[in-house]
Amino acid sequence: MPNIKSAIKRVRTTETAEERNISKKNAMRTAVKRAKTAISTDAENKDELLRFAIKQVDKASQSNLIHSNKADRIKSKLMSANK
């Protein structure tokens, strides 16, 4: 456990940032899964879900939650599955 005041604060901010990042990453994964299932079942709202999933992947990439190459790979797989 840190003794210095700034280190104590840093631990707190790191924990909150970690929770935020995990939440955003989970939301991205859920959006991608929903888009995949909508594409495979040929649902009516698959285009809307696909756009939302791509938006979530881009946001995760911009905030360095996932690498940009991985984001491109995910988007490419979704788009090719939608054809």
UniProtKB/Swiss-Prot annotation:
Disordered: annotated span: 1-21
MF GO annotations: small ribosomal subunit rRNA binding; structural constituent of ribosome
Database matches in InterPro entries: Ribosomal_bS20, Ribosomal_bS20_sf
GO cellular component, one term: small ribosomal subunit
Any single GO BP term: translation
Segments of skewed composition (Basic and acidic residues): 12-21
Keywords tagged on the record: Ribonucleoprotein, Ribosomal protein, RNA-binding, rRNA-binding
Family classification: Belongs to the bacterial ribosomal protein bS20 family.
HAMAP family xrefs: Ribosomal_bS20 (MF_00500)
Physiological role: Binds directly to 16S ribosomal RNA.
Listed name of the protein: Small ribosomal subunit protein bS20
